[in-house]
Amino acid sequence: MIDREQIVRIVSDYLSTGETFLVEVAIHPGNRILVELDSAQGVCIDECVALSRHIESQVDRDIEDYELEVGSTGLTSPLKVMRQWENCIDSELSVLLTNGMKETGRLITVAPEAIKLEVVRMVKPEGAKRKKPETQELTIVMADIKQAVRII
């Protein structure tokens, strides 16, 4: 079976000098290798092709046959690694929490342990008849986040 760590090393070494970074390497049954990349500027098809050829030059198909797919994460794909979070600062996110609640807001800051979102809540001021929008900062611990996606 193809070694996932070997593929991660090959990809990480190849990408070490550029803006493109590794998001995920998955190996599915039948030796189907899926490599996902991302970049602040987006990933072009030429980068995917070049990386695919580099991986093929490093992993011998004669020893073990495999299917290789190299692509970029979609704009609405869930955020998986810290660099994706960092690239989304000042972007609108939809964050699904482990308790089932959903928060939507602008990402202000990100750290390994927590994020800070700017959310708009409808709040009824004391003595007022109607609720008014109020901007609030919400800190969410990373462990409480089930999934987060960019809102386009």
From Swiss-Prot:
It is found in: Cytoplasm. Its main location: cytoplasm. One of its GO terms (biological process) is ribosomal small subunit assembly. InterPro entries: Ribosome_maturation_RimP, RimP_N, RimP_N_sf. Keywords: Cytoplasm, Ribosome biogenesis. It comes from the Bacteria. Pfam families: RimP_N (PF02576). Disulfide bonds: none annotated. One of its GO terms (cellular component) is cytosol. The keyword Protein biosynthesis does not apply. Belongs to the RimP family. HAMAP family: RimP. Required for maturation of 30S ribosomal subunits. PANTHER family: RIBOSOME MATURATION FACTOR RIMP. This is Ribosome maturation factor RimP.
